[in-house]
Amino acid sequence: MTAIVGFDQLSKALIDAGTNLLSPPSSTDDLLTLLDETESLLKNVEQDQPLSMQSALIPSRNALVSVDLLSHPDSDVRVSVVSCLTEIVRITAPETPYSDDLMKEIFRLTIEAFEKLADASSRSYKKAEFVLDNVAKVKSCLVMLDLECYDLILQMFRNFFKFIRSDHPQLVFSSMELIMIAIIDETEQVSTDLLDSLLATVKKENQNVSPMSWSLAEKVLSRCARKLKPYIIEALKSRGTSLDMYSPVVSSICQSVFNTPKVHSPVNTKEHEEKLDLGHSRKENLSKSSSKRPARHETRGINEKEKVRNGNKSSLLKQSLKQVRSESTDAEITGKRGRKPNSLMNPEDYDISWLSGKRDPLKTSSNKKIQKKGSGGVSSLGKVPAKKTPLPKENSPATSSRSLTGSLKRSRVKMDESDYDSDSLSSPRLKKLASCFRDEEPNQEDDRKIGNSSKQTRSKNGLEKSQKTAKKKPVVEAKIVNSSGKRLSARSVAKRRNLERAPLDTLVPQSSKRKKMVSQVAARQLANESEEETPKSHPTRRRTVRKEVESDGFGEDLVGKRVNIWWPLDKTFYEGVIDSYCTRKKMHRVIYSDGDSEELNLTEERWELLEDDTSADEDKEIDLPESIPLSDIMQRQKVKKSKNVAVSVEPTSSSGVRSSSRTLMKKDCGKRLNKQVEKTREGKNLRSLKELNAETDRTAEEQEVSLEAESDDRSEEQEYEDDCSDKKEQSQDKGVEAETKEEEKQYPNSEGESEGEDSESEEEPKWRETDDMEDDEEEEEEEIDHMEDEAEEEKEEVDDKEASANMSEIEKEEEEEEEDEEKRKS
């Protein structure tokens, strides 16, 4: 009951304090006293407060951002207001309590409050020290990156170097160090001004002038060495300055070769610490100060005695975990930090034990914070409170920046794909964070099983491909093959579904070929990747690593062939044509159906060869289980031409499909023949009209004659078209009759055969039926080829007849024109 009463009393006291702040007293001393009372009440509020406590905080939250308090003329009042506001930010973390504009104003006042650290005798010094420690623990400074307050960040760095003194406690030094390291680690691009302030502080001429700022800058540079190395080298080259002008830390950073640490591997703590300090004699360990802090600043869930005993190990672990995050900046993308407000704000890292003495030490809001963020933004490893986790072990120097893979984004840098074992992650927060890593990169485990750690990337066309993903047309990979290699009807069903699901603006493929899967893998490892690569500003896509097969014969033989290229990120095939092959690079140039092109090493890709050139319409008609019987087609033709063609053959399940496909092929040949005849006739008529216009004079009478001739030509063309259509129909009927006669010869007495087949089916084995089906298919293909040859011959005959008819018509027209001219002249 005492806890409940205390909770109610705290809520009531907060409401009264907020109400009083809404109408602040005119006296500065009374206002400072009221702000101190409000701050002490806010310190007793934990993060996971119930709804009643949230309601009790509303008056204070609104009163603290009033114009009267934020713009108060007394600087001590403003510092007290900032101290209360930092508590509000801590309570609501990781969510911001105010709008962006108000948060910018709060950060401006916070940096102004840091100026009070310059005078330890001032009234607001303790408040400024408390604000600094609170910002470092909660990491609310990272919200300034989200709000793009780069000027405020630069001013804060300069103030830290300006106001740090030797008489400051270790808490001030360590808090400044934590804030600066967090800012550098989480920014996507280190600004030139920020780097200049660091380098200017570690100049040798400033070592004796301001030794504390020198030491602070050295600490920050050594802790962020991997992140700052490319920027430092570029700055020194552009200015032409020598390394002798700066601290030995700068030269050590430029000459060092960084290795990729692995979280689950132990390391010697002494050697690791020596590498980070880079031989510097001044070793100010952060853990010594953290172990001496009051109980309110300790991490929840860890015994206070254990923290004092294991302070050094904990600080080194934090240091190594932050290096895991900072080492991935070799492939960093330049630009602004992605806007993820408050996602890096730490929850409260200390326990408020005096509110109710029965609080569970393991209760924290970190799990809730991770669930809220989801996949939108996972905080980096450097922000996880360090516990008894094994320290990282460095790899061999041959490790390159390409080994830093993964799409886990905070500042859009690539993380190491090392496996975070559950045994090595003792704290629940680290375990949850490792599970988020595994969810983000499910393909890394498959790549490790295959044993190929090299990642195939395409930086040339990667950005264009990612932008055109929605425009590319998917290719259906549904293939159902029986024992004889014949495709079944399920393929056509998959095509229909694909056409139904395709959007209206997507180009539906007009040709669906028989595909032959060719799965390949990279045959060699990337052995010369020890050098660090330049940061790239465009994304890359990885190819799925497949099992290794023989790659011989995939050179110039594939030029001109149609293939399907697998895109693992899109999880689909994209159709294209192999345009050329480079023997020197052993690369094929593939032109996709949407016009895009790229060079690929097909031995390292997953792709399919499209062998068959038949159209999608023909495949659909052939694969349909319900085909039109031959008798129905013959009857339709008999009605049209009034010819008696006796057809007594009823197709069985297999012969019916073959006969219907033959008839459909015949129809398609006839359609193509009609189109070609019409094109040739139109072309010849146009040529004849041009000749007539060239021969005639440019007189009005001759123009009238040409118009009359054109009208006559049109009537004659219509008559000629009717004659040609009759001839074509006759030729088609002849072909069908010849076909039916051949079938009658091959299958006489179809009824007897059907009965015989029923009896033979009981005796003959199944393998014989499959052989017969294969023989029938071969005969069918030969018949189709023969029919196509006949169609070509008929086409040539029709062309000859048309040519002779056109010549005779032209001669007649010329004679008639000459006679008309003679009559007119006479």
Curated annotation (Swiss-Prot):
GO terms for cellular component: nucleus. It is found in: Nucleus. Residues 702-724, 752-763, 771-800, 811-826 have a biased composition (Acidic residues). PANTHER family: ANDROGEN INDUCED INHIBITOR OF PROLIFERATION AS3 / PDS5-RELATED (PTHR12663), SISTER CHROMATID COHESION PROTEIN PDS5 HOMOLOG D (PTHR12663:SF55). Belongs to the PDS5 family. Interacts with the cohesin complex. This is Sister chromatid cohesion protein PDS5 homolog D. It comes from Arabidopsis thaliana (Mouse-ear cress).
